Swiss-Prot record:
Gene: PRELID1
Name of this chain's protein: PRELI domain-containing protein 1, mitochondrial
Tissue: Expressed within the blood islands and in the liver.
Assembly behavior: Forms a complex with TRIAP1 in the mitochondrion intermembrane space.
Known role: Involved in the modulation of the mitochondrial apoptotic pathway by ensuring the accumulation of cardiolipin (CL) in mitochondrial membranes. The TRIAP1:PRELID1 complex probably functions as a PA transporter across the mitochondrion intermembrane space to provide PA for CL synthesis in the inner membrane. May be involved in hematopoiesis during avian development.
GO cellular component: mitochondrial intermembrane space; mitochondrion
Length: 215
């Protein structure tokens, strides 16, 4: 049985601005573990929701005792699939992420919901949930505990990264509207798709064998 963790936080920025910051947060000083990001799918539904799928490459070193479970010829980078759905009418954004390699060693699934803070409409509430599991016989509990601690550490980094991008945006011109941001993100997605590597395409194809969360 895996481990579960949940947290509730607040970003001191309006929901529209947090939505814009979400697509602009890499790189930032707190995201050095994020190596690449590629949008591999995007569409607007009939009810005007924005659906996206991104492929991210991250580097997160395992503890020394777990290194022996990696074959010498296997890359230690972790490939992450992120599905997201943006509902501008209800002002919510939900993301679901999971790793598509090294899942036997440790599988981490995360769900985040961004919505207007009910106590302060100028802030955004973020609810995060994570499920950590491992199939390694004899050490699965230790791996899961490590994964849970790593998740909590990454939540702190993610929050600081968001705050950094929000501060930069708030110090510049007024934030762009949701429609403008979505349009620019779509154009960027088209450019990224044209330049996507064969490796990214292959990994995205493998990810599609798992039941899609949103798209």
């Amino acid at each position: 049985m895996g481990k579960y963790c949940a947290s509730l936080g607040v970003l001191k920025g309006p929901w529209d601005q947090v939505f814009a910051a979400f697509w602009q947060r890499y790189p930032n000083p707190y995201s050095k573990h994020v190596l690449t990001e590629d949008i591999v799918h995007r569409e607007v539904t009939a009810d005007h929701k924005l659906l996206s799928r991104r492929l991210l490459t991250k580097t997160n070193r395992m503890p020394r005792w777990a290194e022996r479970f990696f074959p010498a010829n296997v890359a230690h980078n972790v490939y992450i699939v992120e599905d997201s759905i943006v509902d501008p009418k209800n002002r919510t954004m939900t993301t679901f992420t999971w790793n598509i390699n090294h899942a036997r060693l440790m599988a981490v699934e995360e769900r985040c919901v961004y919505r207007v803070n009910p106590e302060n409409s100028s802030w955004t509430e973020v609810k995060r949930e994570a499920w950590v599991s491992s199939s390694l016989f004899g050490v699965s509990r230790a791996v899961q505990e490590f994964g849970l601690a790593r998740f909590k550490s990454n939540v702190t980094k993610s929050t600081k990264g968001f705050e950094y991008v929000l501060a930069r945006m708030q110090g510049e011109a007024p934030s762009k509207t949701l429609v403008e941001t979505a349009k620019e993100a779509t154009e960027k997605a088209k450019e990224t798709a044209l330049a996507a590597t064969e490796k990214a395409k292959d990994l995205a194809s493998k990810a599609a064998t798992k039941k899609k969360q949103f798209v």
